[in-house]
């Protein structure tokens, strides 16, 4: 191998090394930007979740107040029994609700609209 061939190979390797280095530098910049954006999105996501939780709590409190105010005294008593963990529906009346699971029949008794037949 001649000295000029060896020199040309060395120049080629140097150019490839520069291209590789430039590629790595570009990837590093892109990765840094992506990580920064990810951190910003995580913070924004956290704030949005907190805000959503506040809105849900406010809505639940408002709904509970509205429902309680719109119920007759007897329905409010049934609602209190239901909230204490007892069935108030005709199918399971008086039995305890397991794990305080909701009962569609009980909810229908409390909140369902009755029509006079």
From Swiss-Prot:
Zn(2+) binds at residues 87, 89, 103, 106. It is found in: Cytoplasm, Nucleoid. It holds the Pfam family YabA. InterPro entries: YabA. Binds 1 zinc ion per subunit. GO terms for biological process: DNA replication. GO terms for cellular component: nucleoid. Its cofactor is Zn(2+). Keywords: Cytoplasm, DNA replication, DNA replication inhibitor, Metal-binding, Zinc. Its main location: cytoplasm. The keyword Translocase does not apply. Involved in control of chromosome replication initiation. Inhibits the cooperative binding of DnaA to the oriC region, thus negatively regulating initiation of chromosome replication. Inhibits the ability of DnaA-ATP to form a helix on DNA; does not disassemble preformed DnaA-DNA helices. Decreases the residence time of DnaA on the chromosome at its binding sites (oriC, replication forks and promoter-binding sites). Tethers DnaA to the replication machinery via the DNA polymerase beta sliding clamp subunit (dnaN). Belongs to the YabA family. Homotetramer. Interacts with both DnaA and DnaN, acting as a bridge between these two proteins. This is Replication initiation control protein YabA. It comes from Latilactobacillus sakei subsp. sakei (strain 23K).
């Amino acid at each position: 191998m001649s000295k000029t061939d060896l020199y040309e190979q060395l120049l080629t390797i140097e150019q490839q090394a520069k291209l590789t280095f430039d590629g790595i530098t570009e990837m590093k910049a892109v990765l840094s930007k992506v990580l920064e954006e990810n951190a910003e999105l995580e913070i924004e996501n956290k704030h949005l979740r907190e805000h959503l939780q506040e809105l849900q709590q406010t809505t639940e409190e408002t709904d509970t107040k509205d429902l309680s105010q719109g119920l007759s005294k007897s329905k409010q008593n049934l609602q209190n029994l239901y909230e204490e963990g007892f069935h108030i529906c005709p199918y399971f009346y008086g039995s305890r609700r397991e794990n305080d699971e909701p009962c569609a029949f009980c909810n229908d008794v409390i909140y369902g609209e009755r029509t006079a037949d």
